[in-house]
């Protein structure tokens, strides 16, 4: 049994979120939550919420035991980019790209 939780449009770049996602892939849920709780990255807090949602989905919808769950799949895809302009000297302007991502976490029992 595999249960998923998704977050669309998280306001962090996919590249930064993947750094944290790679650390929890394949680990037991308790170990992954502990790792995310003590990480200082912004992506860790976002991924922790998505992982907790996936665990709650597994408990509520499938009646799964939390101790048996592990993080089977984590992937981060690029979301919509917001393009902004930063004024510079002498009438010039630079483009600022504010990136977002879509995060999917799947948990499964062994």
UniProtKB/Swiss-Prot annotation:
Ribosomal protein as UniProt keyword: yes
GO function term, MF aspect, one: rRNA binding
GO CC annotation: cytosolic large ribosomal subunit
One protein family per Pfam: Ribosomal_L22
Classification via InterPro entries: Ribosomal_uL22, Ribosomal_uL22_bac/chlpt-type, Ribosomal_uL22_bac/org-type, Ribosomal_uL22_CS, Ribosomal_uL22_sf
Keyword entries, A-Z: Ribonucleoprotein, Ribosomal protein, RNA-binding, rRNA-binding
Sequence intervals crossing the membrane: none
Single GO biological process annotation from the record: translation
Subunit structure: Part of the 50S ribosomal subunit.
Family statement: Belongs to the universal ribosomal protein uL22 family.
Function, in words: This protein binds specifically to 23S rRNA; its binding is stimulated by other ribosomal proteins, e.g. L4, L17, and L20. It is important during the early stages of 50S assembly. It makes multiple contacts with different domains of the 23S rRNA in the assembled 50S subunit and ribosome. The globular domain of the protein is located near the polypeptide exit tunnel on the outside of the subunit, while an extended beta-hairpin is found that lines the wall of the exit tunnel in the center of the 70S ribosome.
Name of the featured protein: Large ribosomal subunit protein uL22
Organism: Pseudomonas syringae pv. tomato (strain ATCC BAA-871 / DC3000)
Lineage start: Bacteria, Pseudomonadati, Pseudomonadota, Gammaproteobacteria, Pseudomonadales
């Amino acid at each position: 049994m595999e249960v998923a939780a998704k977050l669309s449009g998280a306001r962090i770049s996919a590249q930064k979120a993947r750094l944290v996602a790679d650390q929890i892939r394949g680990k037991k849920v308790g170990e992954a939550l502990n790792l995310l709780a003590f990480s200082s990255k912004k992506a860790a807090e976002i991924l922790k919420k998505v992982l907790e949602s996936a665990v709650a989905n597994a408990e509520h919808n499938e009646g799964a035991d939390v101790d048996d769950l592990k993080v089977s799949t984590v992937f981060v895809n690029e979301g919509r980019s917001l393009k902004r302009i930063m004024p510079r000297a002498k009438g010039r302007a630079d483009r600022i790209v504010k990136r977002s991502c879509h995060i999917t976490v799947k948990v499964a029992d062994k």
